[in-house]
Amino acid sequence: MSASGRPQPMGRLTTHVLDSAHGCPGHGIKIELYRVEGQQLELIATTLTNHDGRCDQPVLQGEDFRPGVYQLVFNAGDYYRARGVQLPEPAFLDQVVLRFGIASADDHYHVPLLISPYSYSTYRGS
């Protein structure tokens, strides 16, 4: 139960990153999650991917997990620079920004990201 006496939402937001340029998980990537309200962005979580390219905990869950528009920011340029990849300045994809909607507080939203220095792909996973 939440503090308001209502049942806790069962949904959660998870993500993982795969480095398609090197064929491995994207580890050590800083990810920021924002809630979007009109033109305002509210930072609600910051995390790093582990050696499997996943976050150790859901990026969002519990009472904070509610319907709305969200934005995940993946710091891909920093990841590739740390791996010694030569990137142009400015990098073509320094940050990958994904804006998406959560319609149900009871669903699992999994947002995988496949990245390379010059492309990315995403989808709603399971």
From Swiss-Prot:
Provide the reaction this enzyme catalyses.
Answer: 5-hydroxyisourate + H2O = 5-hydroxy-2-oxo-4-ureido-2,5-dihydro-1H-imidazole-5-carboxylate + H(+)
Q: Which GO terms describe its biological process?
A: purine nucleobase metabolic process
Molecular function terms, GO-annotated:
hydroxyisourate hydrolase activity
The UniProt similarity line reads: Belongs to the transthyretin family. 5-hydroxyisourate hydrolase subfamily.
- Annotated source species: Pseudomonas aeruginosa (strain ATCC 15692 / DSM 22644 / CIP 104116 / JCM 14847 / LMG 12228 / 1C / PRS 101 / PAO1)
Q: What else is known?
A: HIU hydrolysis also occurs spontaneously, but more slowly.
Q: What class of enzyme is it?
A: hydrolase
Q: What does the annotation say about its assembly with partners?
A: Homotetramer.
Protein name (record): 5-hydroxyisourate hydrolase
Which positions bind substrate?
A: 16, 54, 123
Could you name the domain of life of the organism this protein comes from?
A: Bacteria
**What does it do?**
Catalyzes the hydrolysis of 5-hydroxyisourate (HIU) to 2-oxo-4-hydroxy-4-carboxy-5-ureidoimidazoline (OHCU).
What EC number(s) does the entry state? 3.5.2.17
Key words of the record: Hydrolase, Purine metabolism
